[in-house]
């Protein structure tokens, strides 16, 4: 379910109230809420590719990468999406997009490394709590 957007009003409400209203209520409110037509995950993918194609790798691009991640796009998928889009949008734009995507998905790498470290059994966990006693026959 789409989250109610207020960033436009918070950033530009007094300076450009109509733009803020269109941003929050129309673009995000109406456009992103039509999940019966296109899922949030798919909208995120389309948005990331559209921004990359324009060469917009600013805070809005980072926001949409994070949104894509939160909407279920995996690191493997974003890498494939950006690689595929690079052939149509341009290699330099893809490089810029990858730099930001790498940052957004970096915490996954850290969590994976931590989980891997904790999944390796420690030597003392393999030692039985009491010594084995075999009966004499």
Language-model features: locations:
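Short, structured motif recognition centered on aromatic/hydrophobic residues
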Residues: 42-51, 61, 65, 81-82
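Mid-chain, well-packed structural core segment of small domains
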Residues: 59-79
């Amino acid at each position: 379910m789409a989250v109610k957007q207020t960033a436009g009003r918070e950033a530009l409400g007094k300076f450009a109230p109509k733009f803020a209203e269109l941003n929050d209520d129309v673009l995000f409110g109406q456009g992103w809420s039509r999940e019966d037509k296109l899922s949030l995950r798919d909208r995120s993918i389309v948005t990331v590719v559209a921004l990359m194609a324009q060469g917009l790798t600013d805070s809005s691009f980072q926001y949409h990468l994070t949104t894509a991640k939160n909407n279920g796009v995996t690191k493997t998928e974003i890498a494939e999406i950006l690689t595929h889009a690079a052939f149509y949008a341009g290699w330099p734009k893809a490089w810029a997009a990858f730099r930001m995507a790498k940052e957004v998905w970096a915490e996954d790498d850290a969590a994976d490394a931590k989980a891997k470290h904790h999944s390796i059994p420690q030597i003392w966990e393999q030692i039985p709590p009491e010594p084995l006693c075999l009966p004499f026959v």
